[in-house]
Structure formats: structure tokens, C-alpha cells
């Protein structure tokens, strides 16, 4: 019985270490994936923001042109 305890203890110890290393690597991969998702979200939000700003500028320009036309009565 004593002869089986040492190898089993060694296997348990090595298994625990390898499991711990795998868990650390998995956590690192998940953090990297979260960073990539944040970058994609930021780039999408930046693109949408730029489109909305451009649309707002063009709408404001057309409103101002219409107002200036009505005020100067050159329409």
C-alpha cells in the first residue's frame, strides 16, 4: 500500500500543476479576446459617430442655405 502512495501523490501533484498552467493560459487568451472585442466596438462606434457627424453637418448646411435663401428672398 505504501508503494502505491508515492506514485499516486506524484501524479496528483503533476496533474494539479498542469491544470493550473492550463487555467492561466486560458485566462490570458480570454483577456486577449476581450481586448480585441473592445477594439472592434471602439472602431464601430467611431465609424458610426463620424457618419452621424457628417450627416448632421450636411443637414445643417441645407437648413442654413434654405434660411439664407428665404431671408434674402433670392429663392
From Swiss-Prot:
Q: In which broad location class does this protein mainly occur, judging by the first location in its UniProt entry?
A: secreted
The residue range of the signal peptide is 1-22
Q: What biological-process terms (Gene Ontology) are attached?
A: defense response to fungus; defense response to Gram-negative bacterium; defense response to Gram-positive bacterium; killing of cells of another organism
Which cellular compartments is it found in? Secreted
Where is it found, in Gene Ontology cellular component terms? extracellular region
Give a brief account of the tissues where this protein occurs. Answer: Expressed by the skin glands.
Disulfide bridge positions per record: 69-75
Propiece residues:
23-40
Question: Which InterPro entries does this entry report, sorted A to Z?
Answer: Antimicrobial_frog_2 (IPR012521), Frog_antimicrobial_propeptide (IPR004275)
Keyword vocabulary terms for this entry? Amphibian defense peptide, Antibiotic, Antimicrobial, Cleavage on pair of basic residues, Cytolysis, Disulfide bond, Fungicide, Hemolysis, Secreted, Signal
UniProt function note? Has antimicrobial activity against some Gram-positive bacteria and fungi but has no activity against a range of Gram-negative bacteria except P.faecalis. Has antimicrobial activity against the Gram-positive bacteria S.aureus ATCC 25923 (MIC=19 uM), B.licheniformis X39 (MIC=37.5 uM) and R.rhodochrous X15 (MIC=9.5 uM), is virtually inactive against E.faecium 091299 (MIC=150 uM) and S.carnosus KHS (MIC=150 uM) and inactive against E.faecalis 981. Active against the Gram-negative bacterium P.faecalis X29 (MIC=9.5 uM) and is inactive against E.coli, P.aeruginosa and S.typhi.
Tell me its family. Belongs to the frog skin active peptide (FSAP) family. Brevinin subfamily.
Q: What is this protein called?
A: Brevinin-2HS2A
